[in-house]
Amino acid sequence: MKIIFNADDFGISPGAVYGILDSYKRGVVKSTTLLANSPAFDLAVEVAKENPGLDIGAHLTLTFGRPILQGLETLTDNDGCFRKNYTALESGLADVDMGEVERELTAQIEKILAAGLMISHFDTHHSIEPLIYPVQHMLAEKYGVSLRRHADVSDFGTIKTPDFFATDFYADGVSFETIKKLVQSYIGTNDVIEIMTHPAFIDDTLLRISSYVQPRTKEHTILTSGELQAYLGQQEVEIISFRDL
């Protein structure tokens, strides 16, 4: 079996950038997805360029911060910010202009490309794939990239995805045992499993803008542990990135 440990939220704070970098240099993370509208975007770009082996994707968002574009009336609140989470976006979905979705997501992708980075894959912040999948699929075809496999989406066409996507390593599920259980579920197969991760060092920015904070340091500890790397080696698990699909 093969595993992609993808680190979401690259750029959300300096601590997240450096936590993901350390999880790449000393751990099992080989892929990460960058928020184009994130506070530490420029730092993330700099770090990515200094570490070309770190596979970069776009962490497309309609539920975090402010959009790249202005005038997106169906996607933003009175303050010009995106709705705060999946539920808020879903509840107003009937009024969302999918043309605005396409333009904003394209702007996010183009910002990353304009910074000089190559993009291998797309995923979304707060797992909004089921709400915007037709647009995301179209953009994946346009840019020739892979996608995260979402349980609520069945038709990926010719777009490459992992065989399975695991969200188990999150919040109360952040443990070495969680990863061991996932490995035992797929050991002996040729399947590619993506495990979602969010490693980070806690900083003031992260404390201010994210509700998911403390578990990120535990994720970082596990993902950089010699125990995990030794176990994966013993089980003959190959660690790959989205570039390898």
Regions found by a protein language model. Give the residues of each.
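C-terminal domain-boundary segment and adjacent tail
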Residues: S210-L245
